[in-house]
C-alpha cells in the first residue's frame, strides 16, 4: 500500500495570534521527492517538526495512511504517538548523532522504537538489525566505517550516517530538514541524490526542506514554495520562474 500524507488546515503558533504556519493544506501521495523552499522564518522546519510531532501543532490535521493503518499525527498521544513516530524517518540539519558512539551504534538507535528499554540499555539488538545496519552502511557509501566514532567523521559522512539511521526504522515516510545546509556543493549533490534514490528504492515519499532552489529543481519531482506561513506555490521546477520566485522570496536581490 502506497503511503499518503494529508495535511489540512495546519496552524502552529508559538505566541497567540502570531501563526508561523497559517492554514497549511498539503497532500503527499506515493513515492517521489517533494522539496519545500522559501525564505528563512517562513515555517519550513516548523512544518516538518509538526509532521513527526517534535512540536505540537496548534490546530489542524496531519493524517498519515500506510500499510500499518491510518493515524492523525496531530492528535495521537502516548504509546500511540511512539508507534506512529516509528513510521517516520527524520534526517536533521545538524545530524543529531551521538558523538561519542560509533557509527554502528548510531545506526542501531534507529531501532530503539522497536526495542525494549532493557535491551536498549544493554545495547542488545536483533542480529537481523545488525545485518541490515551493515547493508545500509554499504548503501550510503560508508562500508568499513562501522567502528569509527561519530565525532571523527566529516559533515558529509555524518549526514550519510543520519540517512542510514533514518532508514533503519524502515520508515513509511522520510523527512529531511535542511540536509545540505552545512555541506559543500559536491557533497550536497551526493546527499540529494542519495535521498532521491532511497525514496525510489524503498517506495516511500521523501519530504525535504531546502534553501538551494537549483538543487530542488534538479532532484524534486514536486516543489512546494512557502512564504509567510502559507503555501504560495505547488508544482514542478518548470513553474519556478522569476515572478514566482519573487512571490516566494519577497524580492529580487537574491537573484543577483
Swiss-Prot record:
Main location: membrane
Binding site for ATP: 38-45
Disulphide bonds in the chain: none
Keyword ATP-binding: yes
Topology within the bilayer: Peripheral membrane protein
Keyword check for Nucleotide-binding: yes
Every ABC transporter domain range: 5-253
GO cellular component, one term: plasma membrane
Catalysed reaction equations from the record: phosphonate(out) + ATP + H2O = phosphonate(in) + ADP + phosphate + H(+)
Function: Part of the ABC transporter complex PhnCDE involved in phosphonates import. Responsible for energy coupling to the transport system.
Name of the protein in its database record: Phosphonates import ATP-binding protein PhnC
Natural source organism: Bordetella parapertussis (strain 12822 / ATCC BAA-587 / NCTC 13253)
Gene: phnC
Amino acid at each position: 500500500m502506497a503511503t499518503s500524507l494529508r495535511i489540512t488546515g495546519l496552524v502552529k503558533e508559538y505566541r497567540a495570534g502570531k501563526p508561523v504556519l497559517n492554514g497549511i493544506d498539503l497532500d503527499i501521495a506515493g513515492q517521489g521527492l517533494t522539496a519545500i523552499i522559501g525564505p528563512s522564518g517562513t515555517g519550513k522546519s516548523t512544518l516538518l517538526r509538526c509532521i513527526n510531532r517534535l512540536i505540537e501543532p496548534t490546530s489542524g490535521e496531519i493524517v498519515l495512511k500506510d500499510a500499518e493503518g491510518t493515524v492523525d499525527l496531530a492528535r495521537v498521544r502516548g504509546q500511540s504517538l511512539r508507534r506512529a513516530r516509528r513510521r517516520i524517518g527524520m534526517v536533521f540539519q545538524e545530524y543529531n548523532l551521538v558523538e561519542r558512539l560509533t557509527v554502528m551504534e548510531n545506526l542501531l538507535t534507529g531501532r530503539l522504537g522497536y526495542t525494549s528499554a532493557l535491551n536498549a540499555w544493554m545495547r542488545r539488538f536483533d542480529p537481523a538489525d545488525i545485518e541490515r545496519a551493515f547493508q545500509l552502511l554499504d548503501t550510503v557509501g560508508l562500508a568499513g566505517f562501522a567502528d569509527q566514532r561519530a565525532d571523527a567523521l566529516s559533515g558529509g559522512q555524518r549526514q550519510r550516517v543520519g540517512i542510514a539511521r533514518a532508514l533503519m526504522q524502515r520508515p513509511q515516510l522520510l523527512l529531511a530538514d535542511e540536509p545540505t545546509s552545512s555541506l559543500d556543493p559536491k557533497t550536497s549533490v551526493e546527499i540529494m541524490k542519495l535521498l532521491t534514490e532511497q525514496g525510489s528504492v524503498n517506495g516511500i515519499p521523501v519530504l525535504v526542506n531546502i534553501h538551494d532552489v537549483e538543487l530542488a529543481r534538479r532532484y524534486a519531482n514536486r516543489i512546494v514554495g512557502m512564504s509567510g506561513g502559507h503555501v504560495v506555490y505547488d508544482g514542478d521546477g518548470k513553474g519556478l520562474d522569476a515572478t514566482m520566485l519573487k512571490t516566494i522570496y519577497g524580492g529580487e536581490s537574491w537573484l543577483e
